[in-house]
């Protein structure tokens, strides 16, 4: 692995805990037609009663969002997220609906969807205009606890280097409006139409971050920093860094592996800082090229290793990353989860699997879009 780190000149105390939380957005589909369906009021109210604030409506009425509690371990997060997935599925079944965890429905039209009538979403629709109407997309967000604000600002540009890797592994949105887009993550194409998205800027300090974002807040351009939708951002509500670039995962275990990757990377970067080292900062333009490659090809064509200026297959990159993260994954108890990412790099991500199902259904003369949705339903329930 080429050297990507350099001396910082100042050390730091290693964090004792790297708590994590996972947020997922699901689509609701009718069990018979496999078309998108709006969440009945009774479904939302029972889910909210069952899970005490861990389930909420999303921008579109066909969406539902879940969020785990903060956890110190992936094992604890697994139980929480499994409980949420299973619970939402059981409640949805009472209305002949089922959730799927995918970033774009294979054949639904955004023109047929309606946004949730809440003051927050009404304001968003007004602010974003026609851009908001096309937001028929779902994502996955991972929060990692970082108590120190200065450390959050320091870690952001370092962790940004790995955002394309996370996107490549997670890509689950090859289809849009019934067509193969040629991309592995079409979700990002839609999301990037919003303002204040993409790779985060690099800030020299927490004070600079607050000054910069504060300009928009002070002028009334945005209400607060929740309206900043970078791929990675400091959370407005929690003392965390929130990774937002990933497509949502049909499989529970794949979601947990990506969360484990975030947690282990954060621990590795803090461990380096304690030794007066830091991951080398690469220009946003260069990391953006890897972001595009991940969006377009997923794990299929590899990413650029800027340390030795070469294109490398995802399997090679994951072998190198696993070597770097082994100490951290062992300390966190997540070696199996990190190893699963190597399997995704080798055998394909969700976009790969969806295209395979689509092609096989076409070869049999079946409705390929419906076959993909049935596949997504199976994957949602596979690990429960």
Curated annotation (Swiss-Prot):
InterPro entries attached to this UniProt entry: GCL_type2/YbdK_subfam, GCS2, Gln_synth/guanido_kin_cat_dom, YbdK
Protein keywords: ATP-binding, Ligase, Nucleotide-binding
KW Ribonucleoprotein (keyword) present: no
GO-annotated molecular function: ATP binding; glutamate-cysteine ligase activity
GO BP term (any one): modified amino acid biosynthetic process
Keyword NADP: no
Pfam families xrefs: GCS2 (PF04107)
Main enzyme class: ligase
EC number(s) reported in the record: 6.3.2.2
Matching SUPFAM superfamilies: Glutamine synthetase/guanido kinase
Reaction(s) catalysed (UniProt annotation): L-cysteine + L-glutamate + ATP = gamma-L-glutamyl-L-cysteine + ADP + phosphate + H(+)
Entry superkingdom: Bacteria
Annotated family: Belongs to the glutamate--cysteine ligase type 2 family. YbdK subfamily.
Family annotation (PANTHER family): GLUTAMATE--CYSTEINE LIGASE 2-RELATED
Protein name according to UniProt: Putative glutamate--cysteine ligase 2
Protein species of origin: Ruegeria pomeroyi (strain ATCC 700808 / DSM 15171 / DSS-3)
Lineage, highest ranks first: Bacteria, Pseudomonadati, Pseudomonadota, Alphaproteobacteria, Rhodobacterales
């Amino acid at each position: 692995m080429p050297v990507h780190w350099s001396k910082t000149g100042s050390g730091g105390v290693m964090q004792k805990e790297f708590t994590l939380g996972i947020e997922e957005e699901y689509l609701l589909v009718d069990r018979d037609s496999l078309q998108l369906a709006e969440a009945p009021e009774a479904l939302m109210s029972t889910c909210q009663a069952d899970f005490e604030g861990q389930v909420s409506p999303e921008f579109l009425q066909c969406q539902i969002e879940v969020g785990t509690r903060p956890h110190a371990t992936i094992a604890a997060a697994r139980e929480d997220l499994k409980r949420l997935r299973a619970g939402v599925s059981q409640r949805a079944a009472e209305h002949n609906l089922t959730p799927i965890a995918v970033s774009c429905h294979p054949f639904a039209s955004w023109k047929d969807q309606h946004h949730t009538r809440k003051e927050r979403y009404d304001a968003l629709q007004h602010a974003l205009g026609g851009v908001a109407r096309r937001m028929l997309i779902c994502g996955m967000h991972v929060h990692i606890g970082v108590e120190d604000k200065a450390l959050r600002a320091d870690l952001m540009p370092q962790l940004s280097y790995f955002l394309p890797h996370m996107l490549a592994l997670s890509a689950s949105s090859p289809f849009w409006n019934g067509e193969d887009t040629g991309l592995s993550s079409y979700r990002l194409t839609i999301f990037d139409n919003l303002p204040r998205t993409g790779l985060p800027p690099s800030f020299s300090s927490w004070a600079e971050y607050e000054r910069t974002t504060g300009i928009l807040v002070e002028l009334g351009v945005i209400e607060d920093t929740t309206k900043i939708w970078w791929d990675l951002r400091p959370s407005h509500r929690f003392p965390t860094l929130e990774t937002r670039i990933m497509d949502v995962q049909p499989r529970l275990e794949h979601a947990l592996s990506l969360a484990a990757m975030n947690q282990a990377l954060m621990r590795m970067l803090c461990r380096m800082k304690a030794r007066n080292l830091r991951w080398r900062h690469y220009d946003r333009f260069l990391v953006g090229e890897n972001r595009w490659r991940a969006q377009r090809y997923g794990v299929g064509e590899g990413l650029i290793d800027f340390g030795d200026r070469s294109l490398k297959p995802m399997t090679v990159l994951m072998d190198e990353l696993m070597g770097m993260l082994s100490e951290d994954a062992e300390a966190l108890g997540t070696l199996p989860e990190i190893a699963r990412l190597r399997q995704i790099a080798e055998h394909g991500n969700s976009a790969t699997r969806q295209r395979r199902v689509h092609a096989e259904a076409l070869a049999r003369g079946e409705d390929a879009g419906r076959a993909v949705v049935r596949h997504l339903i199976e994957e949602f329930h596979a690990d429960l």
